[in-house]
Amino acid sequence: MQELQQKIEDLETKLAFQELSVEELNQEVIKLNQLVAKQQQQISLMVNKLMDIEPSNMASESEETPPPHY
């Protein structure tokens, strides 16, 4: 009977540590999700800023005169 009680206590201890680990991992996942959301927002803002930049005066590749060897 004593052995069974010891096994139960060991299992309860392991369960408590696992619950703590799961909670810590959950908090990390929440932080990472927030970070990803912030980075997505920043990327979106950067894309919008890049699209607002006026095109340069340089001709595009399709408008360039081919080099003389063509």
Swiss-Prot record:
HAMAP family: SlyX. Belongs to the SlyX family. This is Protein SlyX homolog. Disulfide bonds: none annotated. Signal peptide: none annotated. InterPro entries: SlyX. It holds the Pfam family SlyX.
